[in-house]
Structures are given as structure tokens and as C-alpha cells.
């Protein structure tokens, strides 16, 4: 906290004394705002964990991915409904963010739906805009689904390690809803959600389904989907991700401590990584 230096009282003040004090006070306020930034919350602006602005974002080359604009997406991708891919109709409308991610096996697009999981979406987009994935995030646990999120730089992992409140689950729970009468499984290929270990346990780790999965989301509110892959390139990319290490990739403890250390690169040389992510387009759809 800035503390003004004390000034001895004098008997006769200069005519400019009052003006000088005002100027000094103004300069101090400018410095405080420059260092700490505005932190104003009112009825229309909520904290990052509650709502993403969908306005300010860092520059990112939209041409890195095959889908560079939301206008390139089909209506089925923008407004998915129950059918051959989705077991149930997801929440409709609201704000959408198109994210492009580069990986060591190619690029992929994620369409993030704020209405699917508003709290989780806000955290993920905050991580994207903080250059989190530019630290080379390892895809360290990949079988039929791929778990990742621990940063290549442990300081980034620590920064986003705080837990989030669960969003409401909109998929049907229980063993009776692992798949429907048409054989559509609860989690189709390319659904994107958080990894967790209990209620309100989401923080900085995610799961992307490489194949349709009937078990996820069955009674785990932290696994509510927040988006899905879109575009043919994305599905071509995840088909190439190395899954040979399975459950025997680097431990979470090792990655938390060391990130992409020499040991990780040496002991798991075939591990794939996400090397960057950025928001390339955004829009809002009516319900």
C-alpha cells in the first residue's frame, strides 16, 4: 500500500499548495490503477469463475485450424440435438466460443458452450487466454479418453489449482442411461469436460473422449460436458494421439512438481502434447 510521506506544517502556505496536493493525489491514483488494475464488480459484471466476458481476448492466428469461423459450422454443430450422436439434447443457445488447439499430432477445434457448464467454461477460457497451453500440456493418461491439463510449467499449474463449484449435470445419470435404445452412448466421441475426484473438485485438468464412452457422467457432476470437437480435422487429430502408455504415463505428482522435465521427456518419449490454444471466434445464439 502506498503511503504519502509526512510533510511538516508551515505557518504560511503557498497559493499553489492546494493544487499541488490535488496533482499528487491524482498521480498516486493513476499509479495504483496501473499496477493493480480495476477490480469493479456490479450487477452486470461477475467474477471470472462465474462468467467469461466473451469480449476481450488475446490475438491468435485463426488459420492454424481448419475451422476459423463459427460461420463455417453446420447447424447440427451449433445447435446439437438428440439423435445419432447425442443421447439427449444439450442446453440450447447462449454464448459460444470457438477454440483452436495445436497438438503434436495436428490441430483441433473445440466449440465451447457457456450454457452447458458456465462455471467450468469461464475457468477454461481464462486458462486459454493466460497462455496456459503454450507451456506444452502433456496428454499424460490416454486410453479411450484422454486426460490432460497439468502445465509444462508447474507455476501455471499452481495458479489454476483452486477448485470450482460443480455446474448442474444435464446428462441422465445412472446405469440405466449408459446408452439409449438406439445404441447412442452417454458421452460421444469428442466431448470435452473436466477430470475430478468428487463434488466440487474441478480445477485445471480435463478429459476429451477419443471414443464414445458409456460410463462418464453417470453420477459424477464434475464430468458435465462444456463443449465438443467440431470439424473433420479435429477427429483426424485425436485418432493419431498416442495411447500406448495408457494408465502408465507420468504421474500427476511428477507433473505437478516438475512439469515437462527431462525425466518426463526421457521416460515417456512418445507422449503427445497440446502446444497452444486460442479463441478464434465467438457468438451468441438465441435459446
Feature annotation, model-predicted:
Residues 2-287:
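Cyclophilin-like peptidyl-prolyl cis-trans isomerases
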Amino acid at each position: 500500500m502506498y503511503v504519502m510521506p509526512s510533510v511538516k506544517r508551515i505557518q504560511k502556505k503557498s497559493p499553489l499548495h492546494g493544487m499541488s496536493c490535488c496533482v499528487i493525489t491524482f498521480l498516486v491514483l493513476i499509479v495504483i490503477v496501473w499496477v493493480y488494475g480495476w477490480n469493479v464488480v456490479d450487477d452486470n459484471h461477475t467474477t471470472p469463475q462465474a462468467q467469461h466476458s466473451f469480449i476481450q481476448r488475446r490475438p491468435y492466428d485463426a488459420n492454424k485450424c481448419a475451422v476459423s469461423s463459427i460461420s463455417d459450422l453446420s447447424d447440427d454443430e451449433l445447435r446439437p440435438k438428440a439423435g445419432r450422436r447425442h443421447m439427449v439434447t444439450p442446453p440450447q443457445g447462449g454464448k459460444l466460443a470457438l477454440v483452436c488447439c495445436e497438438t503434436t499430432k495436428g490441430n483441433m477445434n473445440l466449440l465451447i458452450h457457456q450454457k452447458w457448464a458456465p462455471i467450468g467454461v469461464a475457468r477454461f477460457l481464462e486458462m486459454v487466454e493466460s497462455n496456459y497451453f503454450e507451456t506444452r500440456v502433456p496428454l499424460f493418461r490416454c486410453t479411450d479418453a484422454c486426460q490432460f491439463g497439468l502445465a509444462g510449467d508447474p507455476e501455471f499449474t499452481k495458479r489454476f489449482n483452486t477448485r470450482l463449484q460443480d455446474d448442474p449435470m444435464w446428462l441422465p445419470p445412472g446405469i440405466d442411461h449408459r446408452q439409449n435404445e438406439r445404441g447412442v452412448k452417454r458421452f460421444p466421441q469428442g466431448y470435452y469436460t473436466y477430470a475430478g475426484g468428487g463434488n466440487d473438485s474441478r480445477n485445471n485438468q480435463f478429459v476429451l473422449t477419443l471414443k464414445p464412452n458409456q460410463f462418464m457422467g453417470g453420477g459424477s457432476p464434475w464430468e458435465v460436458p462444456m463443449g465438443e470437437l467440431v470439424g473433420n480435422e479435429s477427429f483426424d487429430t485425436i485418432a493419431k494421439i498416442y495411447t500406448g502408455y495408457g494408465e502408465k504415463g507420468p504421474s500427476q505428482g511428477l507433473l505437478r512438481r516438475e512439469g515437462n522435465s527431462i525425466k518426463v521427456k526421457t521416460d515417456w518419449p512418445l507422449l503427445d502434447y497440446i502446444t497452444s490454444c486460442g479463441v478464434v471466434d465467438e457468438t451468441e445464439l438465441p435459446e
